[in-house]
Amino acid sequence: VAEQMGMELEIQDMAFDSLIPAIQSGKADFAAAGMTVNEDRLKNVDFTDTYAQAAQVIIVTKDSPIASPDDLPGKKIGVQTGTTGDIYADDIENAEVQRFNKGMEAVMALNQGKIDAVIIDREPAKVFVKENEGLKILDEAFTEEEYAIAVKKGNTELLDKMNAAIKELKESGELQKIVDKYITAE
């Protein structure tokens, strides 16, 4: 998108839960790290048009009795801090939510039997399950979501430029190639 806009991109690696504060403080112009649109985030940042579909899924061990989201009440659930999985997990009745800085840390806790399930974005979940033979993703998604780029609230100039770039990339087919390569790659 930055290339399409004719701008230089500087990537800053930071914890997921610090992305919105970084945008608000001006430390970052935008966040495009698997950020999904939800009501809480819309209070603090503006979002571009959607560039890909997403979902929060549930990872369990292959021998787990958990078969659907309905089985999560009362369980120990691992989430990555600041993600929508983190936000939604708080709504699960009597669940003990354990927060981790990285999704891989939650998966490690699941493998060690410290938690019963992990709620995380579908695409990283596929990678974690592929790399951890004893795990599986439940067929039923926990939530369906949309990926978009977050920008500072009220920065309509940047938002409009990004939306125009996303539109051009969609129309040319280039956006789908990027999504296939970086987001939905198996």
Task: Indicate residue ranges for each PLM-predicted region.
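Short, Asp-centered acidic motifs that coordinate Mg2+ and/or phosphate
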Residues: S25, D29-F30, D116-A117, K136, ...
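Periplasmic-binding protein-like
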Residues: A52-V60, R122, K126-K167, I183-E186
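Ligand-binding clefts/hinges and TM-proximal coupling segments of bilobed small-molecule sensing domains
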Residues: T84-N101, E133-A141, K161-E186
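Hydrophobic residues within well-ordered alpha-helices
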Residues: V1, I23-Q24, L72, L110-N111, ...
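Short helix-initiation/N-cap motifs at beta->coil->alpha
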Residues: E10-I23, S64, T81-T84, Q98-Q112, ...
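Extracytoplasmic small-molecule ligand-binding "clamshell" domains
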Residues: V1-G34
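Flexible hinge/capping segments at coil-to-helix
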Residues: V60-I77
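A ligand-binding cleft/hinge motif common to bilobed small-molecule-binding domains
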Residues: M35-K43, Y88-D90, N111, D116-T143
